[in-house]
């Protein structure tokens, strides 16, 4: 080992001599850098002067074409750069510049490092660890790649005077920060995250204005259609798509809001089951259910939640109505009303039906008609008319009566007359299907019947008997339920009518319309109270003459009062009760209104008859009862003269004379009906025939046709000369009726 250490190879000598020369040259360069130029630089300068230029290639000249000449004429400025080019500079050889000092230093350090590895017996002169720790300036700079900069600094191109487009690049001064390596990496990561977030926010902001409104509406419309189609095809699997439709309602565009509401309406109308969803009890929730039952229960509960949210959305829109809404907001309100009406017609059996009815009733409870008023009225009428059982009608009637009470019975007549559309007048008819089956089987021929063995006939009879018993049980249950619901409906309706009659408001005529139609269904125990209320109305002469009505219009309400009282008095079982049935006030009222009634030109017309409207006639409210005033008058006379007994002769003659006078003023059809009634009275009561003779009769005085009491008019001295005048009436029907009247009395 010692000999090997003392032995010196030629390579280390060469290396050591080279190291010494490098050290000397480096010291010499450091000492003379400020005063003398380097030898390498001087040698390069001397070489530049001695080197020759590169020979330019010879290119054959080419003649200019017509296209080249036109191009140069159009763009004269594009060849200006040729004048600034020196042909000699083009032939110069491109040479590299002087290398930086740091390059020689690093190269020498690398060479010394290699030599130190070769010779292990020589000590290192330079401290490489110290040099490696001292970082250079370029190493301290942050290593930023140009690809990290996501922002674009290009500006819009400009157009020069020559008509060319020139791109403009903005000057961006990126400050160089001197950070440590760890801090620079952290700052770069933070900056990149911030830039990514800013870029995402900018992209989100740019998305909205980039898409036009029409295109956005079209896209949303297509998306809503696709989602609705998927829901209708597979409602159980795609029920989650309803949330996406609800999200479209949050759009700032009214059109998309309306489309989302209509889409939800179509979906719910199709997927709502025909039964009411029953919530599970606590015991059922605790028990373990099968997979199919649990899936079905989850579907039903989710559907019910979405339906409740839809009704809540409609309620919010309907509550936001005001007279200051613009056309777009008003259109959204109308769409909400339409959704409400459609759900009433097709989802009244489903859950939350009370809330749905409350929404509809709230929109028609105001003193003025809002948009969609007629649609809600028609939908509620359809519910009342089509509900045979009465369960749904009971819910709606209860909500309506509560609203009437809150409004102090001051609502529109159309709303109040909804009670007249309730289907409680038709008796339930239970068909004996078993009897029909027996009849049809009896009519069949024996050869057409299939052959059955003795055992098969026995089984057939047993099955038939069980089926018949089940049908009878179902029919009894249905009949009991219907009777229960209809009794509750009648009770609520009559209480509403009584309250209206007691208040003597503007809806008294509508209440009388309802009482007259439903009086035959009223319980006998309430007849006395109803007669007392009607008697109070008859005694008050001003109750039928509000400010907006004339005396001619008040005759209808008076006739309704009298006809209702007469119908109650003639009902079955009333005679067995100890009721005060004195109808004297009603008789006087009937006698009093005959003359005002004869002045009504529309006495024989109803709303179903088409006619031109009189522009000078006072406005009339809508009447649900299509009965004409002449029909009501004939009904009163029918009850008073032909169903009652012990009528005084003075009343008979007074009413007959007043009817004859009224026939001179009545319209054509009413005059014919009046003469027919007189003919019937004269044939029933023969003592009235003396009114057609001119012989002198003993009486208490002269006949006074203007006294309102029929017993004090001295009608026994009156003469019926009106039929003789009506023989020459312009109407052939009236003339023929008068001739038949006189012929029946042999005059």
Swiss-Prot record:
GO biological process entries: DNA replication initiation; rRNA processing
Coiled coil: 214-234
Compartment(s) of residence: Nucleus, Nucleolus
Gene Ontology molecular function: any one: chromatin binding
Pfam family, one: NOC3p
Ranges annotated as biased composition (Polar residues): 74-86
Chain spans, region Disordered: 1-142
Keyword Nucleus set for record: yes
Keywords: Coiled coil, Nucleus, Phosphoprotein, Ribosome biogenesis
Family stated for the protein in its record: Belongs to the CBF/MAK21 family.
Name under which the protein is recorded: Nucleolar complex-associated protein 3
Lineage, broadest ranks: Eukaryota, Fungi, Dikarya, Ascomycota, Taphrinomycotina
